[in-house]
């Protein structure tokens, strides 16, 4: 007879990444397993570290602006907005109303583009191949608008400290209206494919649960927090760029599982369209740049500004020593904070669920490692 200890369960350590397609970047996850059950995880980050915050200390305020696009490169517009708002707060200036309105339109369009890439790749990770083609089809239309506006599709560098560099092109407003009209039926189309699909629901429902209290404990923000039932969105709670003028809802769920995070992001895309429609119909006339000198030299002081990026609260802490270069720039990236909750979400689950949970965190390693 074989030794019975051969059949006893033993702990297995499995390396997932850093080169793994479902981590969407160079993330290494060390999984401790008992058969198919996950006993714990340990995330190893830093493979994409570029020293962005240190680079800021050796650049002028304007020179550092393009660097922030390279953190969450999927939502570069939001990164640029947060940075510009922080430096504008240091300077005690405000972008003109026209610039603020255009900023809102482009930021919400970028939110949709970010969520589309998340949805397509998340579905692909789980085994649904069709949605990624549909999502990339609509995302391409959004990227075309960015390209026509500023010449870039991904790392746009669309905003400037004090406002905008570029005025809208002829037909910009109509293209935004056409996109909004086209896009809402497409979201319904995605939901027809996935929301009530038995396989999709089976893979996501009651998987990776994170309660509201646990979200607060970890400092989790964005769709992950709202899926747990916490109605917190900085566009409503601490309005910036004129968001208080727009009528929109904050989508929330109650279970805090992987399925609820999917539902929240789907509804967020609809709300982004709603904001864009109101903004494009109310673009005021006027200048697109505030009273900012060619040489940006804020007075000695500090400022912190946070915005609602597609992945959660994105914050910039800027310290000025009175020179043309920042003394310190500190970034509070939502992906970095949200990733800390991964172990709590996966522990006790199955190894097959790891990919699904990482997918609904919607992390970008450029933002985490900086």
UniProtKB/Swiss-Prot annotation:
It is an enzyme of class 7 (translocase). GO terms for cellular component: plasma membrane. This is NADH-quinone oxidoreductase subunit D 2. NDH-1 shuttles electrons from NADH, via FMN and iron-sulfur (Fe-S) centers, to quinones in the respiratory chain. The immediate electron acceptor for the enzyme in this species is believed to be ubiquinone. Couples the redox reaction to proton translocation (for every two electrons transferred, four hydrogen ions are translocated across the cytoplasmic membrane), and thus conserves the redox energy in a proton gradient. NCBIfam families: PRK06075.1. One of its GO terms (molecular function) is NAD binding. SUPFAM superfamilies: HydB/Nqo4-like (SSF56762). Its EC number is 7.1.1.-. The gene is nuoD2. Its main location: membrane. NDH-1 is composed of 14 different subunits. Subunits NuoB, C, D, E, F, and G constitute the peripheral sector of the complex. The keyword Hydrolase does not apply. It is a peripheral membrane protein. It is found in: Cell inner membrane. The keyword Phosphoprotein does not apply. InterPro entries: NADH_Q_OxRdtase_suD, NADH_UbQ_OxRdtase_49kDa_CS, NDH1_su_D/H, NiFe-Hase_large.
């Amino acid at each position: 007879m074989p030794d019975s200890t051969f059949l006893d369960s033993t702990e297995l350590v499995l390396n997932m990444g850093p080169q793994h397609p479902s981590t969407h970047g160079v993330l290494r996850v060390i999984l401790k397993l008992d058969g198919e059950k996950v006993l714990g995880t340990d995330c190893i980050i830093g493979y994409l570290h570029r020293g962005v915050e240190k680079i800021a200390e050796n650049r002028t305020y304007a020179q550092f602006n393009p660097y922030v696009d390279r953190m969450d490169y999927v939502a570069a517009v939001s990164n640029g907005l947060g940075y510009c708002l922080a430096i504008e707060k240091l300077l005690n200036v405000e972008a003109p109303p026209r610039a603020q309105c255009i900023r809102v339109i482009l930021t919400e369009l970028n939110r949709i583009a970010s969520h589309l890439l998340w949805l397509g790749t998340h579905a692909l990770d789980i085994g649904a191949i069709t949605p990624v083609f549909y999502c990339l089809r609509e995302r391409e239309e959004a990227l075309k608008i960015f390209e026509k506006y500023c010449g870039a599709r991904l790392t746009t560098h669309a905003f400037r400290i004090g406002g905008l560099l570029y005025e809208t092109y002829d037909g910009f407003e109509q293209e935004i209206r056409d996109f909004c009209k086209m896009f809402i039926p497409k979201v319904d189309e995605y939901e027809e494919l996935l929301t009530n699909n038995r396989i999709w629901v089976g893979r996501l429902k009651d998987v990776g649960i994170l309660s509201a209290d646990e979200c607060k404990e970890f400092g989790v923000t964005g769709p992950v927090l709202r899926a747990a039932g916490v109605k917190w969105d900085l566009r409503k709670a601490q309005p910036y760029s004129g968001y208080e003028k727009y009528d929109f809802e904050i989508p929330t769920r109650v279970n805090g599982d992987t399925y609820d995070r999917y539902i929240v992001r789907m509804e967020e895309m609809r709300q982004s369209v709603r904001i864009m429609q109101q903004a494009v119909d109310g673009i005021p006339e006027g200048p697109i740049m505030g009273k900012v000198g060619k040489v940006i030299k804020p007075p000695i002081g500090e400022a912190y500004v946070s915005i609602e990026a597609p992945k959660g609260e994105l914050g910039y802490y800027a310290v000025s020593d009175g020179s043309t270069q920042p003394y310190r720039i500190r970034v509070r990236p939502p992906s970095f904070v949200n990733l800390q909750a991964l172990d709590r979400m996966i522990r006790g689950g199955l190894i097959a669920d790891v990919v699904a949970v990482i997918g609904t965190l919607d992390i970008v390693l450029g933002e985490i490692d900086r």
